[in-house]
């Protein structure tokens, strides 16, 4: 399993099927980049200038909204993940 370092978070992107108001399903090339995911691994947190470590605010299993162009896409063990910094997370759903 991937173990992120520092303030990095590993997420599995949640793909949603997009339809227009009239019911037409959009092809992948016309879709917006997804911004929703599920946290699968969390780093140990960021370190402040004084050396104090701040624990991440998200936990494994959280559903999140993240910045549109954030993170690095990686493929591991046949699955695609996104590794991003905690600061790229905009909100936790629910």
Curated annotation (Swiss-Prot):
HAMAP family: CH10. One of its GO terms (biological process) is chaperone cofactor-dependent protein refolding. Heptamer of 7 subunits arranged in a ring. Interacts with the chaperonin GroEL. Pfam families: Cpn10. This is Co-chaperonin GroES. SMART domains: Cpn10 (SM00883). Together with the chaperonin GroEL, plays an essential role in assisting protein folding. The GroEL-GroES system forms a nano-cage that allows encapsulation of the non-native substrate proteins and provides a physical environment optimized to promote and accelerate protein folding. GroES binds to the apical surface of the GroEL ring, thereby capping the opening of the GroEL channel. Keywords: Chaperone, Cytoplasm. Belongs to the GroES chaperonin family. The lineage of its organism: Bacteria, Bacillati, Bacillota, Bacilli, Bacillales. The keyword Transport does not apply. GO terms for molecular function: ATP binding; metal ion binding; protein folding chaperone; protein-folding chaperone binding; unfolded protein binding. InterPro entries: Chaperonin_GroES, Chaperonin_GroES_sf, Chaprnonin_Cpn10_CS, GroES-like_sf. One of its GO terms (cellular component) is cytoplasm. It is found in: Cytoplasm. PROSITE patterns: CHAPERONINS_CPN10 (PS00681).
């Amino acid at each position: 399993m991937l173990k992120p370092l520092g303030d990095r978070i590993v997420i599995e992107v949640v793909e949603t099927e997009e339809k227009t108001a009239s019911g037409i399903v959009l092809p992948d090339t016309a879709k917006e980049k997804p911004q929703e995911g599920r946290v699968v691994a969390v780093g140990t947190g960021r370190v402040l200038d004084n050396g104090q470590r701040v624990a991440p605010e998200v936990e494994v299993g959280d559903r999140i909204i993240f910045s549109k162009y954030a993170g690095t896409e990686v493929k591991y063990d046949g699955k695609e993940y996104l590794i991003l910094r905690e600061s790229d997370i905009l909100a936790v759903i629910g």
